[in-house]
Amino acid sequence: MSRFVAIFSLTLALSAAIVAQEHSPRRPPASNPPATPAAIDNDGGWVRFNSDIGRFSVLMPEIPTDKTETTPSEHGPYTTHLFVIRHDPNVYLIGWVDYDPSFNFNRQSELAANRDNFVKGIKATLVSTRPLQIDGYQAIEFVAETADRTFKSRVYMVGRRPYQIVIGYPKDQEDQVTINRFFNSFKIKPS
C-alpha cells in the first residue's frame, strides 16, 4: 500500500508540475540562478545540470526548479524529488523517490507502476511502452498522449531508487533531436 502511495505521490507531483508549467507564464531567466544542489556549465545553448543529491547529470534548456517533499508512511518516510522547467513549447521533468531502507519492492513492478500512475495522473492514453537496458540499468520507455500533448518518458531503476524523466510537447511539434538530446544526456553518477 505505501509503495502505491509513494508512486502515486511522485505521479501527482509530476502531473501537477506539468499542469502548472503549461498554465503559467514562462518566467524570465534569472540574472543570478537560484541556489540549487547542482553545478552548471553551458553546453551548446543548453545547461548541464548536475545534481549531487540526485547523483545524475542532464542537459536542459535552463536550470530547473526543485521541489522536495518527505512523506510519512506505514513503512517509513519516503522523499520525492522533482526538477521541472517549461521551455516553450516543451516541459521537462526529472523525478525520483528515496524509500525508507526497510521498504522492499519488486523493481520490475516499480517501473510499470510509475508508468501507469503517470499516465493516469495526467489523464493520458498509453500509446507504447518498451523495456530497455540503459547504461546497465533496468528501464522502460513509454509514450502517452492527451488531447493536445505527447509525453515521452523513461523510468530507470538504480539500486533502490526509481528515476523518471519526461519531456512533454504539443502533438504536432515532435522534435526528435531535442528529445534525444534530453534523454541521451541523462547520466547516473556512480555512488
What is the role of each PLM region?
Residues 1-4, 21:
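Positively charged n-region of N-terminal signal peptides that target proteins for export
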